[in-house]
């Protein structure tokens, strides 16, 4: 079978006849060179975050405490003491196994910092804490030159006084007044008669 060669684009004619340039495909490089260039390009892209000067790989809110290793201690016990994982201690101190802690006199324990950490200029605080902070009410300024809205038409209040079914005339009022006077006179006369009868009864009782 015939071998297919890459297409060679022609170069400009300089007067010395048509010549062919280099092939479209670049020359194959060694594996070490390509790997090193790839790692360098990835490192350049990860050093800075978009729109900020903060480093992506920088530790966020993390500080280290020096712990002195004593006999009988285990990596699990140290991790439980400081509230971290064994993988974090091994990563910071570059330990390959749990038994390697006795090869070092001290260990660096990563703990969370109490200070607020900033990432891309923003605080890493949880949104729950923001809800507890009191919010200031916005100040609303009124424009003096703006025309005031027209007053609303006043609604007449309902009459709370009970309306009588029949209005009393002056004649009816005087008639009722006369009846009350007559009734009071009759009552006074009756009381007087009752008092006279009691006196007569007492006098007759004394005579007996």
UniProtKB/Swiss-Prot annotation:
InterPro entries: LYSM1-4, LysM_dom, LysM_dom_sf. SMART domains: LysM. Residues 27-42 have a biased composition (Low complexity). Residues 65-109 form the LysM domain. Residues 147-156 have a biased composition (Pro residues). SUPFAM superfamilies: LysM domain (SSF54106). Residues 129-140 have a biased composition (Polar residues). Pfam families: LysM. Residues 1-54, 122-169, 187-208 are annotated as: Disordered. It comes from the Eukaryota. This is LysM and putative peptidoglycan-binding domain-containing protein 2. It comes from Danio rerio (Zebrafish).
């Amino acid at each position: 079978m015939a071998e297919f060669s890459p297409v060679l684009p022609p170069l400009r004619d300089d007067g010395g006849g048509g010549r062919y340039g280099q092939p479209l495909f670049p020359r194959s490089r060694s594996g070490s060179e390509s790997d090193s260039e790839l790692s360098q390009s990835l490192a350049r892209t990860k050093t800075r975050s978009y729109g900020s000067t903060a480093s992506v790989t920088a530790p966020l809110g993390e500080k280290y405490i020096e712990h002195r290793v004593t006999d009988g201690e285990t990596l699990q016990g140290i991790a439980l003491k400081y509230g971290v994982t064994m993988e974090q201690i091994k990563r910071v101190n570059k330990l390959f196994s749990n038994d390697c802690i006795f090869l070092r006199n001290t260990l660096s324990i990563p703990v969370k910092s109490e200070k607020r950490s900033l990432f891309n200029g923003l605080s890493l605080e949880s949104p729950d804490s923001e809800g507890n902070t009191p919010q200031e009410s916005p100040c609303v300024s009124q424009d003096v030159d703006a025309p005031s809205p027209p007053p609303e038409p006043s609604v007449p209040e309902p009459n709370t006084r009970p309306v009588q079914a029949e209005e009393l005339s002056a004649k009816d009022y005087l008639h009722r007044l006369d009846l009350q006077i007559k009734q009071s006179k009759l009552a006074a006369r009756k009381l007087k008669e009752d008092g006279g009868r009691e006196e007569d009864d007492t006098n007759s009782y004394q005579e007996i």
